[in-house]
Structure formats: C-alpha cells, structure tokens
Design a protein with these regions (language model features):
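Residues forming the flavin
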Residues: 1-32, 73, 97-217
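Glycine-rich active-site loop/strand segments that organize a redox cofactor
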Residues: 18-53
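A short alpha-helix capping/helix-coil boundary motif
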Residues: 37-41, 87, 161-166
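Helix-loop-beta segment of a Rossmann-like dinucleotide-binding subdomain
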Residues: 43-47, 80-105, 168-172
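A conserved beta-strand/loop capping segment in the N-terminal third of enzymes
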Residues: 52-89, 211
Length: 217
C-alpha cells in the first residue's frame, strides 16, 4: 500500500541476536541462545522453529552483512555486539538505532535487483482485497487493487503466502504506524483462514497512559 521504505519496520531499533565467535569463547552456543529465547517467551514458543532460528542466525547475519547492511563495528573492524532483550551474552548485531531501516533498505535493494533481472514482479501501491477460493475452499490466488487508478485485478497463484507485518492498531493505544491496521489479517480470517497465537501481537507499553509520567518515554 505504501512504498517498502515507509513500512513500519523502519522504526525497529534493537538488532538481531546470534551466537558469534566472541560469545563462543565465553561458553555460549546455539542451545543457550535457544534456552534464552524460550525462557524469554515464557515457554509459549513453538520450540522447533526457535532452534532452527538460533542455528541459522550466524549465517543470516553474515549474509545481511555481505548484502551491505551497515552494522556497527569495533575498532578492529569486526561486527560490534551488545546485550539486548534479556540475553546472557553480547549476541546482538545492530546498526546504530536504525537497524530495521538498514535491513529493509538492503533487502529492498535485492528485491529490485531480482525484479530488474525478471525473476520477480513487485506490486507497489496495490492493496490486498481478498483471496480467490474455489468451490472446495482451496486458495487459487488473490484479488488486489491499484490505489492510484482503482483498477482491480485477480492474480492466479499456486500458493498465497501472507506476510502482512504488524497489526498494532487493533489496540486502542499503539505506537505503531497508521498503516498497521490488520486489514489483510481480517480479510483472510473472514474467508475461513485459521488465526492463531494472537497473544504474540506486540502491545507497546509506552502507549499505555497512566497517572505517573514515568511510564511514558
């Protein structure tokens, strides 16, 4: 609906966690990263993909570094790390206070390179209207609308992957972008798609009003 570089990911500041050479020398490993993550999630996490994420983390950060994400570095030129989010070790790779923005820009650049090579087609400024279901309820594509010309088009597909991002505006108070409405989530839910794990939708507590101003940032 909006340019990729205006999506809410540009507001993410923290960083990405993974085991690294420095933490390994201190006794860290992927199982400890896994334990930190599951414990931090109050044991609600589906654990197999958490372990896969911890195993893949070092390679993912290395790939992003090679794609041009300007991670902070030490005076020796190595990736700088910090502790973040209750971790036991300094696992977090970060790009100043704009990690989300830098990741988004690097990945957007790769997507546009793939489009230039004819490998993918980007539909920017198009809004998702709904799924195309056959009589058996099997998804066969989706319907989208050009928000400039108002043209409506149906796209045929073997599979439709929903990656809609956050939907924080379903709460009365939220610090999320005005585009995080959850509209796409609602449309597919109304078309019989199962919705689960709603407790993992982030409620950014800095937006909760209180008598004490210390609660606000």
């Amino acid at each position: 609906l909006v340019p990729v570089k205006r999506s809410h990911s540009v507001c993410a500041q923290g960083g990405i966690n993974s085991v690294n050479d420095t933490t390994r020398a201190q006794g860290d490993n992927e199982w400890k990263h896994f334990d930190d993550t599951v414990y931090g999630g109050d044991f609600l996490n589906h654990q197999p993909p958490v372990k896969e994420m911890c195993d893949a983390g070092p390679k993912v950060i290395d790939l992003l570094d090679r794609l041009g994400v300007p991670f902070n570095r030490t005076s020796e030129g190595r990736l700088d790390r910090r502790r973040f989010g209750g971790t036991l070790y300094k696992r977090t790779a970060f790009a100043g206070a704009t990690t989300g923005q830098q990741l988004l820009y690097a990945l957007d650049e790769q997507a546009r390179r793939w489009e230039a090579e004819g490998l993918i087609k980007l539909y920017e400024h198009w809004e998702f209207l709904g799924l195309v279901l056959d009589d058996a309820g099997v998804c066969r594509g989706c319907v989208i609308q050009d928000m400039f010309s108002m043209e409506i088009r149906a796209l045929k597909a073997d599979a439709v992957v929903m990656a809609t991002g956050g939907c924080g505006l379903i709460f009365g108070k939220s610090t999320m972008s005005m585009i995080c409405t959850g509209g796409a989530n609602s449309r597919v839910y109304q078309e019989s798609v199962k919705y689960a794990n709603g407790e993992f939708i982030q409620v950014h507590t800095t937006a909760i009003p209180g008598a004490d101003k210390l609660r606000l940032m």
